[in-house]
Structure formats: structure tokens, C-alpha cells
Amino acid sequence: MKHLLRNLWIAALIVCCNFQQAFAQQMPPIPIDKNVRIGKLDNGLTYYIRKNNLPANRADFYIAQKVGSINENDDQRGLAHLLEHLAFNGTDHFKGNSLQDYLQSIGVEYGRNLNAYTSVEKTVYYFTDVPTTRPTAVDSCMLILKDWSNGISLTKEAINDERDVVHNEYRMRIVGQQRMIERSLPKLYQGE
């Protein structure tokens, strides 16, 4: 009887998930804001620019790359995440920590409004709430985005340092997930 109930529960869950997926596919596309200027560069980069006066004299900068863990082979696990970390350790135009130092000098704080993340299908770098009152700030921020797309410094020292950081992040994440799984298993398989 317990097996029958569990199998019925799983079947109901599958039906609900498939219904939700079918419904999601029927949704109309999200309309594009007419105030967004969209273009594509010769190198394939698609850009979106939208003027926003609130807050005044501030800008947000993002670069989303269609590269994530899905692009890795089994022997490359974590490479996309490692590259994300290396982007903050030096680029063609910002050596060492000078990228973070420059952004801090114009009012951008690492962690609060300067960060990045890697997911399965993409890597996104961003810095937000950037004061644009300094005449060269926007140009310098665009140069940072350019460097993040094609100018990350890949020195042996930086790679070795960040490899340890990425491994520790992974271990911390796995330990937390493992604890959640271990707590859930007795409830999922109660009485078996």
C-alpha cells in the first residue's frame, strides 16, 4: 500500500510538472521596452542600452555571456566559475587588483554593487549604481566590460590562488546540500 501511494504521488507530480511546462510554452513573448536601444556588433555581441534618470547621475553595467557549466567537459568541471573569479584578478587594461581599486575610487563596492555569478548556461558580470559624474567613468566602465569579454589575465599564480577559493566554495555548497539531503531521506523513505 505504501508503494502504491508513493507511486501515485510521483505520477501526480509528473503530471503537474508537465502541465506547468505546457502552460509556460503557450505564454506570449514579453514585449520589448521601446525605450531600449538594441544592437549587434560585428563580433556578435548583442547590446541593450536604456536611459534611466532615476537615480540621477548613476548607471548600471552588465555583461552576460552565454557560457556556463553546461559548456564544460567532465574533466573541466568548475572552469567557467574559475574564469569568473579570475576576471577580478586582472585584465588587459586593469592589472592585478586595479580594476577593483578603480571602481572603489568612483564609489563602487565589491560585493555590494560589484559582483558576478556563473550558472548552468551563463556567466554574468555586473557593477551597479555607478556614479557617472566623473567624465571618464562611463568610458572606463565600458572598457572593463570589454576586458571581461576578451581580456582576462590568466597567470599561473592567479589561477592557483583562485582554484583553491573555487574548491572551498564548492565544498561549502556541497556540505550544505548534503546535510539537507541527509535530513530529507528519512522522511522520504519513512518505514522502508
Language-model features and meaning:
Residues 1-25:
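Bacterial Sec-dependent N-terminal signal peptides
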Residues 29-63:
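Mature N-terminal segment immediately following signal peptide/propeptide cleavage
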Residues 55-57, 65-190:
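Active-site-adjacent, His/Asp/Glu-enriched structural segments that form or flank metal-binding
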